[in-house]
UniProtKB/Swiss-Prot annotation:
The gene is glgC. Disulfide bonds: none annotated. CDD domains: ADP_Glucose_PP (cd02508), LbH_G1P_AT_C (cd04651). Homotetramer. This is Glucose-1-phosphate adenylyltransferase. InterPro entries: ADP-Glc_PPase, ADP_Glu_pyroP_CS, GlgC_bac, GlmU/GlgC-like_hexapep, NTP_transferase_dom, Nucleotide-diphossugar_trans, Trimer_LpxA-like_sf. The keyword Zinc does not apply.
Length: 386
């Protein structure tokens, strides 16, 4: 294959159990976001925009829709003879196969894939975060620091720090302490789950970790602490842009709502750093004569005959007459009947809401699953149908 300076490996096998019915039939990285994207589009687009064209996507849970979405990688310019994008399911041995045992084991099982390109560096990414980042700048930082490993970090609120891998650094950003999800965090500098390793070094640690039967085969719990204990040079790369772990209903809803803010830091309209996706051709949106739309994202193919406020409507959504949708996310091809009220809710793909229904309006975010039908006159509040 020849030498490639850096290979990206995207961990995209997550079940996303905290997203409930939204991930019942698909992997978390395939969950729709922002009107016309899926979560996996963000790391894939970041790779393409960073000039990284050799990418492995490690799939596992319910991969069919994710695999179909990625295809041969055309939207991200990853349909290449040399390199490009490769879908990497768990390795199947003659004795039978197992799921990836952890993030480190997932990379271990694909050592042969990475070795085909003989890279100097490997970039490890999570497939379920929303952000825009230039990985080339992170690689330059890694080289300047002459590091064995570089971890992307972001400051988080202190009261949320226990949800993340937390590290302490010196003034030169070298890491001297790392704790995975500590009960009492010593700082608020959190790992973004973005790593650059010298490949030869990482390969040694992956093999040692695999041989350790007591290991959980995880980067945060095993690989990073082992490298630190051995005196490896590890540095933190600070990131100050928008970054969201959308692993919960609340965070997914909030990330969509963030797109509607006037000071939105993600800025999906930035032509210099576009987010690419697989999008079918749709007719132009139609806004009816009695419709009212304010502060919302309405994607092509939508038909709106009601009121839409502060909401995100994906492709092909139909909104009936005298219907009010507020603070909500309505996913692809959902059909909303007449005289419906939807507030603070996520409506899944191809869901059907019959007329005269009330969904949401409570303190918690209401969820309607993909392809679910809500019968005429139903009231759904705090996940209880009446």
């Amino acid at each position: 294959m020849g030498n490639t300076e850096i290979v990206a490996m995207i961990l995209a096998g997550g079940q996303g159990s905290r997203l409930g019915v939204l991930t019942k039939k698909l992997a978390k990285p395939a969950v729709p976001f922002g009107g016309k994207y899926r979560i996996i589009d963000f790391p894939l687009s970041n790779c393409a925009n960073s000039g990284i064209y050799t990418v492995g996507v490690l799939t596992q849970y319910k991969p069919l829709e994710l695999n179909a979405h990625i295809g041969i990688g055309l939207p991200w310019d990853l349909d290449r003879k040399d390199g490009g994008v490769s879908i990497l399911p768990p390795y199947q041995e003659e004795k039978g196969g197992n799921w990836y045992k952890g993030t480190a084991n997932a990379i271990y099982q694909n050592i042969e894939f990475v070795d085909r390109y003989d890279p100097e560096y490997v970039l490890i990414l999570s497939g379920d975060h929303i952000y825009k980042m230039n990985y080339t700048k992170m690689l330059e930082f890694h080289k300047e620091k002459n590091a064995d490993a570089t971890i992307g970090v972001i400051e988080v609120p202190v009261n949320e720090a226990s949800r993340f891998g937390i590290m302490n650094t010196r003034d030169d950003m070298s890491i001297y302490e790392f704790e995975e999800k500590p009960k009492i965090p010593k700082s608020n500098l959190a790992s973004m789950g973005i790593y650059i390793f010298n490949w030869k070094t990482l390969k040694k640690y992956l093999r040692n970790d695999e041989a350790n039967k007591s290991s959980s085969n995880d980067f945060g719990k095993d690989i990073i602490p082992s490298m630190l204990n051995d005196g490896g040079k590890m540095v933190a790369y600070p990131f100050e842009g928008y970054w969201k772990d959308v692993g919960t209903i609340e965070s997914l809803w909030q990330a969509n709502m963030d797109l509607l803010k006037s000071d939105n830091k993600l800025n999906l309209h930035d032509q210099d750093w576009r987010i690419y996706s697989t999008n079918p051709v749709r007719p132009a949106q139609y806004i009816g004569e009695n419709a009212k739309v304010t502060n919302s994202l309405i994607v092509e193919g939508c038909t709106v005959n009601g009121t839409v406020q502060n909401s995100v409507l994906f492709q092909g959504v139909q909104v009936g007459k005298n219907t009010i949708i507020k603070d909500s996310v309505i996913m692809t091809n959902a059909k909303i009947g007449d005289n419906v009220i939807i507030e603070k809710a996520i409506i899944g793909n191809d869901a059907v809401i019959r007329k005269d229904c009330v969904i949401g309006t409570g303190d918690e975010i209401e969820i309607v699953a993909a392809k679910e039908e809500v019968k005429m006159g139903s009231i759904m509040k705090n996940s209880k149908a009446v």
